[in-house]
Structures are given as structure tokens and as C-alpha cells.
A protein has these predicted regions:
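Sec-dependent N-terminal signal peptides
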Residues: 1-19
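Short beta-strand segments
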Residues: 115-118, 241, 280-284
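Thiol-/selenol-based redox modules, centered on thioredoxin-like
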Residues: 27-39, 43-44, 162-213, 323, ...
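Short, small/polar residue-rich loop motifs at catalytic or cofactor-binding pockets
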Residues: 57, 80, 155-157, 213, ...
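Hydrophobic beta-strand anchors of alpha/beta hydrolase catalytic cores
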Residues: 83-84, 114, 160, 239-240, ...
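Conserved redox-active cysteine motifs that mediate thiol-disulfide chemistry
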Residues: 86-103, 242-267
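A short beta-strand-turn-helix
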Residues: 61-82, 217-239, 267
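Short, internal strand/loop/helix patches
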Residues: 129-165, 281, 292-330
């Protein structure tokens, strides 16, 4: 919880960082430099939960690159070490670390498989492609379908996963620097398991489509109590609002257009929720957010709709929400009508359509 609180404070401070792409250093250069100070904009405190992945069989997963290639990780285990870096386009520590990722790829891209995996939280393929171009990323760039993020238990980006030739996790953490560099070298020196490679099978991700009944999904209230997303038949249709407590403030420093959309979405929902014809509920992303941060947000913004924290990311994954802000429209039978995401200008029309369908 201290880690999340620390990261939340860092995010809300909106520290601007000039993260323009730099030329790739020579392979013999130091990989990712010294460990950062907690006062550095690129610093993120380590999550002890990630360390529990060390020694576990890596996930059997096929990733699809932004240029259409499929990468089956299971085909690599036992043959090559694998380094997966999870990141987001707007994340300041992710941007700070990108030169280090380029160095690692320049040094060891011919000896291990290195993949930049976008976490698909507040991003889409257009933003990811532009970021890869701006930051001169030449390794495969993919977008997670939600299963890798779920398996990792990710609550903040970036996340580094270093996997040895035996298919087991050597390192899982947020920071680059000496510890990551040592893990990369350990992976390169690793040997395949003599009796084959064990993997972790991930459950298929089921995303709701129009007409599907909304399942009960556990959330957290701002006081840390367990609550359930409204579901089942009701006399009124429902609208579920998806956003993040930090998207207006934090993204203002890296993606001001996206921050403006978050603000517009919040203001639209505030107005639309004033009527009594639709039941509203808000779901806030768990990324970089603890219940205390949600409580602070509620105190500051005084939202007219009740809010819940998507503490495991299950609600965002179940509804397939990738962009902020978003609204899911639900009929009186508790079935999904449609999802509108990333474009708050369409919210009012969507709500009018839902009201007319009663």
C-alpha cells in the first residue's frame, strides 16, 4: 500500500520530463545506468508482489506485434532467454527507461528475445505505433490482451520480466538499473531444463459483447471495503463510467489531449447523471491507485455518481475497456448494449439512445 501511495503522489505531482528520443548508445555502453533516487521523476518503488513471480514457470502466451506478427512465447522457452517490458505511452518512468531498453536491445537483441509489451491501459494501437516511432523502438512491439497484465498482477508500469532458457522467471520488477542488468546477464548464461520446459497456462480472456449479461464483479470502495458492480435486471437502464483518478492531472504532462478528454468525460458524466432515468456507477482503474487515492479524488471532485476501485483490473478487462474515458450502456435486463470509449463527445448521444430504448 505504501508503494501505491508513493506512486500515486508521484503521478499527481505531474512532474514533466523531457523524454524525447535519444540516439542508441553503443552496445558496449553501460546498459541502464545506476539505480534512481526516489526523488527522480523516473523512480517507481518496487512492488514485493512482483518478486513472488521469480522462479515460477513463465506464461504460455502468443503475443501479436503491431505489424501483425505472432510471437508464441512457448516456442522460445528452452531455446532463448526472453525479456518482456510492460509499459504505457503516457507513463513517465516508462519514458525515462526507454533509452535503457534500446541499449539492451542493441547489446543483446541477437542473443535473447526482447519484446516491448504495451499494457493496454489507456492506450490503443494508434498511440502505441506513434510511441514506437517517436522512441525509435526496433524490437517487436506488442499490445497485451489483458492476460499478461492479469498474471503479473500489475498495479503500475513499467514492469520488467526476465525469463531464463529454462522458461522460469529470473526477475520481475519496476526499476531498471544494476538489478535488471544482472538479471539480463543471468538469463543469457542460463541453460535449458534437461527434461523440457514447464509453462503456466493462462485462462482465455472473456470480453463482453453486445447482448451479454453483466456478471457480478468485485470492486473496492474508497474505505477499502468490498463492493459489487451493479448487475442483474433493474427498472432503469444503467451506465457504467470508466476512468482513472489521475488521468486529468498526470496525463496533462505527457499527453495533454488525452487529459482534456478525461476532463470532458468527467464533466459530461456529471451533467448526464443529473437526471433520474438512468442508474450510474463509476469504475476507476486500479493502476497507480489505492483506496486512499480514490478517497482523495472523491473529496476533491465530489462526483455525483458512486465510485468503485477496480482493484484487480477485472472490470476493465471484462468490458474490454482500453481508453479513458469510457461508458458502458446496460439495458433493464442487465445486458450490455454497447461500449463507448475514448470519445466523450459521443456520450450524450449514447445516453439518449439508451433512454429511448427503455
Amino acid at each position: 500500500m505504501r508503494r501505491l501511495a508513493h506512486v500515486s503522489l508521484l503521478l499527481m505531482s505531474c512532474c514533466a520530463y523531457g523524454a524525447s528520443p535519444q540516439a542508441t548508445p553503443a552496445p558496449e555502453a553501460k546498459l541502464t545506468g545506476a539505480a534512481l533516487s526516489p526523488k527522480d521523476p523516473g523512480y517507481i518503488e518496487e512492488d514485493p508482489v512482483l518478486a513472488k513471480l521469480v522462479g515460477k514457470p513463465a506464461p504460455a502466451l502468443t503475443l501479436k506485434s503491431i505489424d501483425g506478427r505472432s510471437i508464441d512465447l512457448s516456442d522460445l522457452y528452452g531455446k532463448r532467454p526472453v525479456y518482456l517490458k510492460l509499459w504505457a505511452t503516457y507513463c513517465i518512468p516508462c519514458r525515462v527507461q526507454m533509452p535503457g531498453l534500446r541499449k539492451i536491445f542493441a547489446s543483446y537483441g541477437d542473443q535473447m528475445t526482447i519484446i516491448a509489451v504495451n499494457a493496454a491501459v489507456g492506450d490503443d494501437i494508434g498511440k502505441v505505433k506513434q510511441f514506437a516511432q517517436d522512441f525509435d523502438l526496433h524490437m517487436p512491439v506488442t499490445i497485451d490482451d489483458g492476460r499478461l497484465v492479469e498474471w503479473v498482477g500489475m498495479k503500475a508500469t513499467p514492469v520488467h520480466l526476465v525469463i531464463g532458457r529454462d522458461g522460469r522467471v529470473i526477475f520481475a520488477g519496476h526499476q531498471d538499473g544494476p538489478t535488471l542488468d544482472a538479471a539480463i546477464k543471468q538469463a543469457l548464461a542460463s541453460k535449458a531444463a534437461p527434461a523440457g520446459v514447464a509453462t503456466t497456462t493462462l485462462a482465455e480472456l472473456v470480453t463482453l459483447k453486445a447482448g451479454d449479461v453483466i456478471p457480478p464483479i468485485e470492486l473496492q470502495s474508497s474505505d477499502g471495503k468490498s463492493i459489487t458492480l451493479p448487475h442483474g435486471p433493474d427498472s432503469r437502464p444503467r451506465a457504467i463510467y470508466f476512468s482513472a483518478t489521475w488521468c486529468e492531472s498526470y496525463m496533462k504532462s505527457t499527453q495533454p489531449d488525452e487529459a482534456a478528454k478525461c476532463k470532458e468525460g468527467r464533466e459530461q458524466v456529471d451533467k448526464l447523471a443529473a437526471g433520474q432515468t438512468i442508474e450510474w456507477f463509476g469504475v476507476m482503474s486500479h493502476m497507480w491507485t489505492a483506496p486512499k487515492a480514490l478517497a482523495n479524488y472523491e473529496s476533491k471532485m465530489k462526483p455525483p455518481v458512486p465510485l468503485g476501485l477496480d482493484s484487480t483490473g477485472a472490470a476493465f478487462r471484462t468490458f474490454g475497456v482500453k481508453r479513458f474515458p469510457a461508458i458502458a450502456l446496460i439495458d433493464t435486463q442487465g445486458r450490455l448494449v454497447k461500449l463507448v470509449e475514448g470519445d466523450p463527445a459521443k456520450f450524450a448521444t449514447a445516453i439518449s439512445s439508451l433512454q429511448a430504448s427503455k
